[in-house]
Amino acid sequence: MSEYSLFTSESVSEGHPDKIADQISDAVLDAIIAEDKYARVACETLVKTGVAIIAGEVSTSAWVDLEDIVRNVILDIGYNSSDVGFDGATCGVMNIIGKQSVDIAQGVDRSKPEDQGAGDQGLMFGYASNETDVLMPAPITFSHQLVQRQAEARKSGLLPWLRPDAKSQVTCRYENGKVVGVDAIVLSTQHNPDVSYKDLREGVMELIVKHVIPAHLLHKDTQFHINPTGNFIIGGPVGDCGLTGRKIIVDTYGGMARHGGGAFSGKDPSKVDRSAAYAGRYVAKNIVAAGLAERCEIQVSYAIGVAQPTSISLNTFGTGKLSDDKIIKLVRDNFDLRPYAITTMLDLLHPMYQATAAYGHFGRIPVEMTVGDDTFTAFTWEKTDRADALRAAAGL
């Protein structure tokens, strides 16, 4: 991190319009995978005042009540009356999902599952850093925690005047690659019209900001921007149109690592935009957890219909205990990055995806979930179960 003395990342809440769209897309994916785990799904969502539109391509034997899924997601987030500007019970729902192209299917499907081709060409990145306990960059970690806490305070009634839409931004100061302070915090939260700015600022500072940001990182010159425009009453899909896939930096590393451009939500694991990015995080996190490097960024790339990656590249930014070339060899020896192998390695054919669609896909804690008769672990790409093998293979 020596190239930056300050670095800023942002996050958004589950009630942000783009995140509503992401959660709807992944809820549709989950419902289909729960019935047909080998389904091919690409679901896009648009939300605006009074309407939610879902579109895309699906190949499945399952039947799911798409309208009910869409409404439940919106209601669960907290948009349940015209007073907050959007109501999942009464909004219009339009479904224009079609079938997957047979040209794509013939390029992906194989008689031998392990030969499954990539669902599209593309490049994906994975990243890890030892600057936080979850091996993620601090600015995006704190940003996620702020909007998560906002949702907790809203839903629990701790701050009853909060509404679902919110955004956060955190600027961290670095010295020699380590976080030594937080220079600026921005938190904008939707609220009802009855709360005064004084009460809002005090409540947010005491029960959200100070609850999240470690006190030793705050200093006399830290800037706090709480609802800097004053009022934030109109929010959610009324304030802005929401679309699936528009928060790809929020979803990943907050700009600290590069991004191949592909979004995650609404895509089944045959789409390497999603599964290979998860695998990249898994590889990078295990490299850092093994002590092979303090920071690691990995890039993989694919050609449509081809199983083997077209490239695997790696950068430890001068923090590696071994050369990057030697670490790449360890990656090739210990991780199979073909699409089917990724799906198997990370056990991705379960309805786990709506949980990923807000507050970041990375830096989360692996958790056991049960949906119907299916019990599985979500966020498997956050496990560090390959670290010991990597350390041993490296001779450390």
Swiss-Prot record:
<dbReference type="InterPro" id="IPR022631">
    <property type="entry name" value="ADOMET_SYNTHASE_CS"/>
</dbReference>
<keyword id="KW-0808">Transferase</keyword>
<dbReference type="InterPro" id="IPR022636">
    <property type="entry name" value="S-AdoMet_synthetase_sfam"/>
</dbReference>
<feature type="binding site" description="in other chain">
    <location>
        <position position="271"/>
    </location>
    <ligand>
        <name>L-methionine</name>
    </ligand>
</feature>
<feature type="binding site" description="in other chain">
    <location>
        <position position="16"/>
    </location>
    <ligand>
        <name>ATP</name>
    </ligand>
</feature>
<dbReference type="InterPro" id="IPR002133">
    <property type="entry name" value="S-AdoMet_synthetase"/>
</dbReference>
<feature type="binding site">
    <location>
        <position position="240"/>
    </location>
    <ligand>
        <name>L-methionine</name>
    </ligand>
</feature>
<comment type="similarity">
    <text>Belongs to the AdoMet synthase family.</text>
</comment>
<dbReference type="InterPro" id="IPR022628">
    <property type="entry name" value="S-AdoMet_synt_N"/>
</dbReference>
<keyword id="KW-0479">Metal-binding</keyword>
<dbReference type="GO" id="GO:0000287">
    <property type="term" value="F:magnesium ion binding"/>
</dbReference>
<keyword id="KW-0067">ATP-binding</keyword>
<dbReference type="Pfam" id="PF02772">
    <property type="entry name" value="S-AdoMet_synt_M"/>
</dbReference>
<feature type="binding site">
    <location>
        <position position="240"/>
    </location>
    <ligand>
        <name>ATP</name>
    </ligand>
</feature>
<feature type="binding site">
    <location>
        <position position="18"/>
    </location>
    <ligand>
        <name>Mg(2+)</name>
    </ligand>
</feature>
<dbReference type="GO" id="GO:0006730">
    <property type="term" value="P:one-carbon metabolic process"/>
</dbReference>
<comment type="subunit">
    <text>Homotetramer; dimer of dimers.</text>
</comment>
<dbReference type="GO" id="GO:0006556">
    <property type="term" value="P:S-adenosylmethionine biosynthetic process"/>
</dbReference>
<feature type="binding site" description="in other chain">
    <location>
        <begin position="246"/>
        <end position="247"/>
    </location>
    <ligand>
        <name>ATP</name>
    </ligand>
</feature>
<dbReference type="GO" id="GO:0004478">
    <property type="term" value="F:methionine adenosyltransferase activity"/>
</dbReference>
<dbReference type="GO" id="GO:0005524">
    <property type="term" value="F:ATP binding"/>
</dbReference>
<keyword id="KW-0554">One-carbon metabolism</keyword>
<dbReference type="Pfam" id="PF00438">
    <property type="entry name" value="S-AdoMet_synt_N"/>
</dbReference>
<keyword id="KW-0630">Potassium</keyword>
<dbReference type="GO" id="GO:0005737">
    <property type="term" value="C:cytoplasm"/>
</dbReference>
<feature type="binding site">
    <location>
        <position position="267"/>
    </location>
    <ligand>
        <name>ATP</name>
    </ligand>
</feature>
<feature type="binding site" description="in other chain">
    <location>
        <begin position="165"/>
        <end position="167"/>
    </location>
    <ligand>
        <name>ATP</name>
    </ligand>
</feature>
<keyword id="KW-0963">Cytoplasm</keyword>
<comment type="pathway">
    <text>Amino-acid biosynthesis; S-adenosyl-L-methionine biosynthesis; S-adenosyl-L-methionine from L-methionine: step 1/1.</text>
</comment>
<feature type="binding site">
    <location>
        <position position="263"/>
    </location>
    <ligand>
        <name>ATP</name>
    </ligand>
</feature>
<feature type="binding site" description="in other chain">
    <location>
        <position position="100"/>
    </location>
    <ligand>
        <name>L-methionine</name>
    </ligand>
</feature>
<dbReference type="InterPro" id="IPR022629">
    <property type="entry name" value="S-AdoMet_synt_central"/>
</dbReference>
<comment type="function">
    <text>Catalyzes the formation of S-adenosylmethionine (AdoMet) from methionine and ATP. The overall synthetic reaction is composed of two sequential steps, AdoMet formation and the subsequent tripolyphosphate hydrolysis which occurs prior to release of AdoMet from the enzyme.</text>
</comment>
<dbReference type="InterPro" id="IPR022630">
    <property type="entry name" value="S-AdoMet_synt_C"/>
</dbReference>
<feature type="binding site">
    <location>
        <position position="44"/>
    </location>
    <ligand>
        <name>K(+)</name>
    </ligand>
</feature>
<dbReference type="Pfam" id="PF02773">
    <property type="entry name" value="S-AdoMet_synt_C"/>
</dbReference>
<keyword id="KW-0460">Magnesium</keyword>
<keyword id="KW-0547">Nucleotide-binding</keyword>
<protein>
    <recommendedName>
        <fullName>S-adenosylmethionine synthase</fullName>
        <ecNumber>2.5.1.6</ecNumber>
    </recommendedName>
</protein>
<feature type="region of interest" description="Flexible loop">
    <location>
        <begin position="100"/>
        <end position="110"/>
    </location>
</feature>
<feature type="binding site" description="in other chain">
    <location>
        <position position="57"/>
    </location>
    <ligand>
        <name>L-methionine</name>
    </ligand>
</feature>
